[in-house]
Regions:
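Cleavable N-terminal export/targeting peptides
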Residues: 1-27
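Short loop/turn motifs that connect adjacent beta-strands in outer-membrane beta-barrel proteins
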Residues: 23-29, 64-76, 102-110, 153
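Outer-membrane beta-barrel initiation region
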Residues: 25-62
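Transmembrane beta-strand segments that form the barrel wall of outer-membrane beta-barrel proteins
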Residues: 32-44, 74-86, 158-164
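Outer-membrane beta-barrel translocator/channel fold
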Residues: 39-40, 111-143, 147
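Solvent-exposed loop/turn segments connecting transmembrane beta-strands
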Residues: 44-52, 82-93, 104-106, 168-174
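Outer-membrane beta-barrel "beta-signal"
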Residues: 56-58, 175-187
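Residue-level signature of outer-membrane beta-barrel architecture
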Residues: 60-64, 84, 99-103, 148-150, ...
Length: 187
């Protein structure tokens, strides 16, 4: 587990370093976000219990020239992220498209995300483990966020994400709903 975590951190660091270099030349990486989240909030219990906070998240949002021609309002951006669990649950990487809508006058925004997710159970599960099934190890991810823009290009963001498995993990609907808070930095 620690070895995989170390590899994930090194990989994300290398991506971050190369992306910052690319950003300086092409402005392909206009925003980086990081934060913490509580997993499985749809299972009941106290949402504000600090023991539920068991994940760390990093997300990179990219700028693609001319992609916003498809959006009447807001900003469309591809994203790439990873969530690491410190409680022995699945970690996962995800990618997809973010649609951010800024309020006209106020420094607030809302965002919707949709895409795919690859869970660590895909790599560390037994060959016959249902966690390796398509839709379980690799599946869908949707998220919704609300944020406040802070000075100097920073923002604070509250996020709810849902990772459905459509019953492919061998158990009826092992879907996961997580809530978190992140700090974003625009360049």
């Amino acid at each position: 587990m620690r070895n995989r975590l170390a590899r994930l951190i090194v990989t994300l660091s290398l991506l971050l370093c190369s992306a910052v270099t690319a950003q300086a030349q092409f402005n392909l990486l206009p925003e980086i976000r990081g934060g913490i989240s509580a997993r499985g909030v749809d299972g009941g219990g106290n949402l504000f219990d600090p023991n539920r906070i068991s994940d760390a998240n990093v997300e990179l949002l990219f700028a693609v020239p001319d992609i916003n021609k498809w959006s009447i309002i807001g900003e469309l951006r591809p994203h790439l992220g990873a969530t690491v669990s410190f409680s022995g649950q699945d970690s996962y990487a995800y990618t997809g498209l973010s649609w951010t809508i800024q309020a006209p006058v106020l420094p607030v925004f809302v965002e919707a995300q949709a895409g795919g997710v690859a869970r660590s159970s895909l790599l560390n599960g037994n060959q016959t483990d249902p966690a390796r099934n398509f839709g379980c190890g690799i599946g869908a991810r949707v998220a919704a966020s609300a944020g406040v823009n802070l000075p100097l290009g920073a923002s604070i963001i509250a996020t709810v994400e849902h990772l459905p498995d459509f019953g492919t993990c061998g158990t009826p609907q092992r879907a996961n709903t997580n809530v978190g808070v992140r700090l974003g930095f625009r360049f």
